[in-house]
Curated annotation (Swiss-Prot):
SUPFAM superfamilies hit by this protein: Glyceraldehyde-3-phosphate dehydrogenase-like, C-terminal domain, NAD(P)-binding Rossmann-fold domains
Organism encoding this protein: Mycobacterium avium (strain 104)
Entry-linked InterPro entries: Acetaldehyde_dehydrogenase, Acetylaldehyde_DH_C, NAD(P)-bd_dom_sf, Semialdehyde_DH_NAD-bd
Name under which the protein is recorded: Acetaldehyde dehydrogenase
Catalytic activity: acetaldehyde + NAD(+) + CoA = acetyl-CoA + NADH + H(+)
One GO MF term attached to the UniProt entry: acetaldehyde dehydrogenase (acetylating) activity
Entry keywords, A to Z: Aromatic hydrocarbons catabolism, NAD, Oxidoreductase
Family, per entry: Belongs to the acetaldehyde dehydrogenase family.
Matching SMART domains: Semialdhyde_dh (SM00859)
NCBIfam families in the record: ac_ald_DH_ac, PRK08300.1
Catalytic-site annotation from UniProt: C121 (acyl-thioester intermediate)
Pfam families: AcetDehyd-dimer
Highest taxon of source: Bacteria
Biological processes, Gene Ontology terms: catabolic process
Amino acid sequence: MAIVGSGNISTDLLYKLLRSDWLEPRWMVGIDPQSEGLARARKLGLETTHEGVDWLLAQPEKPDLVFEATSAYVHRDAAPKYEAAGIRAIDLTPAAVGPAVIPPANLRQHLDAPNVNMITCGGQATIPIVYAVSRVVEVPYAEIVASVASVSAGPGTRANIDEFTKTTSRGVETIGGAKRGKAIIILNPADPPMIMRDTIFCAIPEDADRDAIAQSIHDVVKEVQSYVPGYRLLNEPQFDDPSLNSGGQALVTTFVEVEGAGDYLPPYAGNLDIMTAAATKVGEEIAKETLSVAGGTR
């Protein structure tokens, strides 16, 4: 398989893929001949190029799977080329050419999709919790607040805050299962940098089974921890009775934090780590499914 993009996210992703029992990174594709990511990939034994996607597509042997961490406009241009070449794509950009995937919630539904999108870091961290609640009770409204270290937010994130909030809000509804969703991102300027912290508010019926909701949240947290070990609850889910402050709804509030594995990105950049870890998880499940359908074993 190939990694398209040679920046920080692609480099962190490379280290995760090299540990995988199911995925074998062979190529890294960039556009900057001086890229540190390409240099690292070469030292680790990958074939590299600074000539872009067209170079990859011109190779006599092509990858089965591409992970792309470039930009939305680059991926929108490349996606039809991948599909024409029979290459599956996992998209870590905001392009959203294919369906958005949150592993605990809807990965199984999209294992045969030619192109899947990893939505946003805030989505990967918070939508699993909304999903955990909505599979137990109806959630008329959910709101997530994602706080990330300012130094971990690159120019792309800063230029696309509105896109982040809209995309994540939509995912809270369509994947998380809330009737209505809202997302807020906070760039925390603290120094030393703070790890990613998220707050998830879900409106629930007054007579909801609180024990069942709490258990569902714990189950989903364990599922996320299977691929993001630094994902954890800060405390037990908090339940509040209906009040004027909550619009007359009962609430469950969940606090999580995400510490990165420190493969290449620093541990405080859990917002980026959860994207590369989730993408690796999706790639592994696609590989397992492909082998299963083909009748093979690994």
